[in-house]
Amino acid sequence: KGEGAFLNDEPIHVSGAETLSESLVTIGTSPYYHELADWNFKVFKEVFLSCQDIRRLGSAALDMAYVACGRVDAFFEAILQPWDFSAAKLLIEEAGGKVTDFAGKELPVGMPGAVLAGNGKINEELLRILSEK
């Protein structure tokens, strides 16, 4: 911790996107929480209408690694287990980004929860959408 993030011995950094409207956002869903389908798709639509585009890669760890190296600008998922986000959280923070819950608070250690990972510049815009739905 405190030494930066690297890919193939080269330093990586989160993207420089300043606004959600210029951002590419990855989204996550879980096959274990079908009761969240209505909420998920309502939020996905709102984000889709506010950003450049959205993607669904299928792996929270990969989504978050892409945030860390600037390939995408943000990622969110309503419920993730700590083993799905803990390592990637450190990677993003070391690359200059920010990872919180949907209230903008620090993620609880060892507990499942909502995860928003971003470059730090667009997190507030996404939090407004995520918290009002």
Please give the residue ranges for each predicted region.
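Acidic beta-strand-loop-alpha-helix segment within the catalytic core
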Residues: K1-L62, P112-K133
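Small-residue (primarily alanine) positions within well-ordered alpha-helices
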Residues: A5, A88, A95-G97
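A short, glycine/Asx- and small/polar-enriched loop/turn
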Residues: L20, A68-R71, V109-P112
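Short secondary-structure boundary segments
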Residues: T29, A78-L80, A103-K105
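Hydrophobic residues within well-ordered alpha-helices
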Residues: A65-A68, K89-E94
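Alpha-to-beta junction loops
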Residues: C69-A74, G97-K98
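Acidic donor-binding loop at a coil-to-helix junction in glycosyltransferase catalytic cores
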Residues: W83
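Acidic, metal-binding active-site segment of PIN/NYN-like and related structure-specific nucleases
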Residues: G96-M111
